Amino acid sequence: MNEQAIRPSQGDVEFQRRLYEDPNPTRRGLHSTRRDWVLDQATANSKVNDRVLEVGVGCGVFTEALAAAGRRVSAVDINPAFLDNVAALEAVDIYLKDATRPLELGDHDLAICSEVLEHVPPDRSQAMLDSLHGALRPGGTLVLTTPQRFASVELVARLFRFKPVLALARRLYGSADELGHINLLTAGQLEGQIAKAGFTIAARRRFGFYLPVIAEFAGKPGAALLRGIEQAIRPLPIVRGLLWTQAYVLRRTA
């Protein structure tokens, strides 16, 4: 995995945790909705004492919840700070490993890989999915999320590559940063890699809509409006590509 694809601030535990406490209701909702969906799927597809692999620990929000729910967690990351943050949790084993290579940690009942694939070099994307497949027992489940290539959030973030735009955004919003997303995939591209890795799709969902002016300056009414637009465009085949997160429940069949 490419450590350069992770900005310094994004490698900070507190930065990651603050995403779920953002005072802006739209930004907070984008992250919290994804967190809640992942936890719901992880809980529904595992039971007490199951072995759970988490690739990309971040601030430990999933690690903590799953360990508290009686799962035995193998926490894998390339960032030692993220692993140190969860090392003291009961029933959690930490591993400083590159998940684009075989993990060799035995079979797991469930794996979680949330908002990681976009940080992986494009030529290693398939290798990460192959590695996750190899870490699951036959019949095991992978809960996977990653941004959509043409999501409105990502289109706005690409403008931050231009320093004048980034400076203006920081002046208007108080903070702004490049996302470090180097492997953005369309649903078709991702589902091709999913199939090649040997997974079948048990469930899929897309969510999270962002328009800068409404999100940043319209407060709670703006957040409600954007949620309404999200619900309206979710069924539309092309337009739903503007939604931020593509989320999957995948099964290893063999």
Predicted regions located by residue number:
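Conserved N-terminal segment of class I S-adenosyl-L-methionine
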Residues: 1-114, 123-129, 184, 205-209, ...
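Short, hinge-like loop/turn segments at secondary-structure boundaries
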Residues: 91-93, 159-163, 219-223
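A short glycine-rich, Lys/Arg-flanked "PGG" loop and its adjoining helix->strand segment in the class I
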Residues: 126-141
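Conserved class I S-adenosyl-L-methionine
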Residues: 143-167
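Short, flexible, basic/aromatic active-site loop/helix in glycosyltransferases
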Residues: 165-176, 230
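Acceptor-substrate binding/catalytic loop of class I
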Residues: 173-189
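A C-terminal cap/extension of S-adenosyl-L-methionine-dependent methyltransferases
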Residues: 188-192, 202-254
